């Protein structure tokens, strides 16, 4: 039977705008009732190495609609039909070269044609059929992917609303553009994250996010109350790395030993929007040999929140958040060891303000860039 947790106290990280992932403001178009203006959110995350190449991540948010039906006769005065929104959706365009002009990005969205279909294997899936992508994004990952298959609960807000016999189209409304260093583009292979062994100890990371929402809202019911009264608190876990089990029987592998390992790794966390809302971790110190496969050569790793908690990730599509605290937890890797040992918690994980800074760009990420209707 598992014992109680051992927690090392940590003072709350200082409040700063750099720890936040802000939500898109709701701006309605003046022409056309109930239409949202297309908007861009821009962010810059640099590794601090001037020799590191810069790339751009483009992530899109929008709505799935039924494809309008065409009539037998159409005149030039006929207005384009717009079908009601079925549900919200997210789709990443991936990484590519740095894009300079936000106005061109917004205008280019009119050339996008992405169809949506529902299918199933061992679970429900969504198939994005990329029929047309603007030339502006021809060097991005999405231009090479004519078909994108994904789990429905990760990319569609309410997949249960999509039914058979209806053709659907994805309409992009919001662009989230992240200019970052190329060294930040690293994710751990899923088989490595899922592997468990009695020969190692697992290091998990818990991120406490303060989510902007009203306490009487529906989403607040699935989260903890914020003691500071500034929103709600959500916890998300992911597997950080493994540490080799010590074989020295004369040494105590307790919270002091674990804290020493974490201090030497000099872990720092931040939040961004790359593959959707994403936690970035940087190990600026010594990385143990067993942990090295979980970081790239410069000590970076990205953990998309939708891989660990799809429901929380979808909440963050429309709600802002900030990192309240971060902790590393030492557990047994295999389930038998996990059930018999206590969790050892190291809470002194730094929140990197500069790496999560929305400022430092020549134009405001939340200023209306173009009055374009959501078609």
From Swiss-Prot:
A cellular component annotation (GO) from this entry: virion component
GO term, biological process aspect, one: virion assembly
GO MF, one example: structural constituent of virion
Pfam families tied to this protein: Matrix_Paramyxo_C, Matrix_Paramyxo_N
Entry-linked InterPro entries: Matrix_C, Matrix_N, Matrix_Paramyxo_C, Matrix_Paramyxo_N
Top-level taxon: Viruses
Localization, UniProt: Virion
UniProt entry keywords in alphabetical sequence: Viral envelope protein, Viral matrix protein, Virion
Main localization, broad class: virion
The keyword Cell membrane appears for this protein: no
Keyword Lyase listed: no
Function: The M protein has a crucial role in virus assembly and interacts with the RNP complex as well as with the viral membrane.
Family: Belongs to the morbillivirus/respirovirus/rubulavirus M protein family.
Official protein name in the record: Matrix protein
Source organism phylogeny: Viruses, Riboviria, Orthornavirae, Negarnaviricota, Haploviricotina
């Amino acid at each position: 039977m598992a014992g109680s947790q051992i927690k090392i106290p940590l003072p709350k990280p200082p409040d700063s705008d750099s720890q936040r992932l802000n939500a898109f403001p709701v701006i309605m178009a003046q022409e056309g009732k109930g239409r949202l203006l297309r908007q861009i959110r821009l962010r810059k995350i640099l590794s601090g190495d001037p020799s590191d190449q810069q790339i751009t991540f483009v992530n899109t948010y929008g709505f799935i609609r039924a494809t309008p039906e065409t009539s037998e006769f159409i005149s030039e005065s006929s207005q384009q039909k717009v079908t009601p929104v079925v549900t919200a959706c997210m789709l990443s365009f991936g990484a590519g070269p740095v894009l300079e002009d936000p106005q061109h990005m917004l205008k280019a969205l009119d050339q996008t044609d992405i169809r949506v279909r529902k299918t199933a294997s061992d679970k429900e899936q969504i198939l994005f059929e990329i029929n047309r992508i603007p030339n502006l994004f021809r060097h991005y990952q999405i231009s090479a992917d004519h078909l994108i298959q994904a789990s429905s609960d990760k990319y569609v807000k309410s997949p249960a609303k999509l039914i058979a016999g209806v053709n659907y189209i994805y309409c992009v409304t919001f662009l989230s553009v992240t200019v970052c260093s190329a060294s930040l583009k690293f994710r751990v292979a899923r088989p490595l994250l899922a592997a468990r062994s009695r020969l190692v100890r697992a290091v998990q990371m818990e991120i406490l996010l303060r989510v902007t929402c009203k306490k009487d809202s529906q989403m607040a019911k699935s989260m903890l109350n914020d003691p500071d009264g500034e929103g709600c608190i959500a916890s998300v876990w992911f597997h950080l790395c493994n540490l080799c089990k010590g074989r020295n029987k004369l040494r105590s592998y307790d919270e002091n030993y674990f804290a020493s390992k974490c201090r030497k790794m000099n872990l720092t966390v931040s939040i961004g929007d790359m593959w959707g809302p994403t936690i970035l971790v940087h190990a600026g110190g010594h990385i143990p040999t067993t942990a090295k496969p979980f970081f790239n050569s410069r000590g970076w790793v990205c953990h998309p929140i939708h891989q660990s908690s799809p429901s929380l990730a979808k909440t963050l599509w429309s709600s802002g958040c900030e990192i309240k605290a971060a902790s590393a937890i030492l557990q047994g890797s295999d389930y038998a060891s996990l059930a018999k040992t206590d969790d050892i918690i190291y809470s002194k994980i730094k929140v990197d303000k500069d790496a999560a800074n929305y400022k430092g760009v020549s134009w405001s990420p939340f200023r209306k860039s173009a009055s374009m209707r959501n078609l």
